[in-house]
């Protein structure tokens, strides 16, 4: 198993944006010092839920101060961007970093964000599909020729090409069974999270669907990776870990519930009906439920090691994206968590 750090760049009250951004960048820069394999900033807009509107800008800064850590996105929301610009930006980042890019992509889900950009959320799937194909062609074709519903290009030379050949690994965020199947059909790596209304057993079942689809479409499952976003915190003791991590986690869920779907009383968005029921669930969820379902793994180091080992054995996850820097948790607590992960947890799980 490999280990990464997910960064939402959330902005709860009480800290300036400058403080929050500086702290999260410092943690990302120190990731390789503490033995982590990757860092993954997440794109979000227009609320305290997340203020990293441009992961590529964030990662360009990290690329110049690190040597080994992989530079992932968790994720870039493709319907908000012109695909040629995405291809150019991440090809340049791949060149600047010497081939360390891991491009995570998704179609987005927050109505506030779609409205802010004037994008029709009901068309997110078709925008995502076209954008993804264009990005891959930009990276692999000498000249870009493409005729789609939303994008058309004729004999376009897109440069630079990525450092990695044929291109950086691409990861697709998946929630529904259909999206797991799509990732398998396309031969993409997979990003998933039991945070979003599921369980570890449910995740294992969907990963099985993904791997079966890979094989049935001519892709070798052993060459594709599965990354899991898990809220993980290693404390000095079981009780202290809960005391330190419960408040940030509950802040996250209450904030997530504000933006995941249309407001109560408003109609569900076509193609996103499930998110309305998710909104109601996350607004009512309590800490003990999160721990029981495996959404949160929090405790002293032996407990965290055991639970992560169960996750690995049950699901076959290759890459843990530790979701710890959330809800305004302090920089000092984050450093302590990273030190314990390095010393007591990661060595036995690699």
Residues covered by each model-derived region:
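N-terminal beta1-alpha1-beta2 module of alpha/beta enzyme domains
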Residues: 1-65, 69-71, 165-168
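Flexible, glycine-rich active-site loops centered on histidine and acidic residues
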Residues: 2-19, 79-146, 150, 189-192, ...
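Conserved, mostly hydrophobic/aromatic
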Residues: 3, 31, 35, 43, ...
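Hydrophobic faces of well-ordered beta-strands that scaffold small-molecule active sites
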Residues: 3-7, 39-41, 71-73, 101-105, ...
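Active-site mouth loops of central-metabolism enzymes
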Residues: 7-22, 76-84, 164-174, 233-235, ...
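Glycine-rich, proline-tolerant flexible connector loops at the mouths of alpha/beta enzymes
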Residues: 38-62, 77, 194-199, 323-334
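Alpha-helix-loop-beta-strand connector modules within alpha/beta enzyme cores
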Residues: 52-73, 127-130, 339-350
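An alpha-helical appendage that flanks or caps ligand/catalytic pockets
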Residues: 125-158, 200-317, 350
């Amino acid at each position: 198993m490999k280990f990464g750090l997910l960064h939402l760049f959330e902005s709860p009250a009480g800290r300036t944006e400058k403080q929050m951004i500086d702290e999260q960048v410092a943690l990302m820069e120190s990731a390789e010092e503490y033995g982590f394999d990757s860092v993954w900033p997440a794109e979000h807009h227009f609320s305290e839920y997340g203020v990293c509107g441009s992961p590529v800008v964030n990662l360009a800064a990290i690329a110049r101060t690190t040597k080994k850590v992989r530079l992932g996105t968790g994720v870039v929301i493709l319907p908000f961007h012109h695909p040629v610009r995405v291809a150019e930006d991440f090809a340049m980042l791949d060149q600047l970093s010497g081939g360390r890019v891991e491009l995570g992509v998704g179609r987005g889900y927050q109505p506030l964000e779609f409205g802010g950009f004037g994008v029709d959320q009901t068309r997110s799937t078709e925008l995502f599909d076209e954008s993804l194909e264009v990005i891959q062609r930009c990276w692999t074709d000498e000249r870009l020729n493409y005729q789609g519903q939303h994008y058309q290009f004729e004999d376009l030379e897109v440069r630079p090409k990525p450092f990695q050949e044929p291109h950086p690994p691409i990861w697709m965020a998946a929630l529904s069974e259909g999206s797991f199947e799509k990732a398998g059909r396309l031969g993409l790596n997979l990003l998933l999270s039991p945070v979003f209304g599921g369980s570890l057993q449910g995740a294992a079942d969907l990963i099985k669907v993904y791997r079966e689809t890979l094989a049935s479409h001519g892709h070798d499952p052993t060459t594709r990776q599965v990354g899991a976003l898990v809220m993980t915190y290693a404390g000095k003791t079981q009780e202290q870990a809960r005391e330190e991590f419960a408040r940030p986690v509950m802040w996250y869920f209450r904030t997530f519930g504000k933006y995941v779907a249309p407001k109560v009383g408003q109609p569900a968005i076509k193609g996103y009906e499930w998110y309305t029921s998710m909104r109601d669930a996350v607004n009512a969820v309590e800490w003990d439920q999160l721990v029981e379902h495996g959404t949160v793994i929090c405790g002293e180091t032996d407990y965290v090691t055991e639970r992560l080992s169960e996750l690995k054995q049950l699901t076959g996850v290759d890459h843990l994206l530790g979701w710890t820097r959330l809800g305004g948790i302090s920089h000092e607590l984050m450093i302590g968590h990273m030190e314990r992960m390095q010393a007591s947890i990661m060595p036995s799980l690699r």
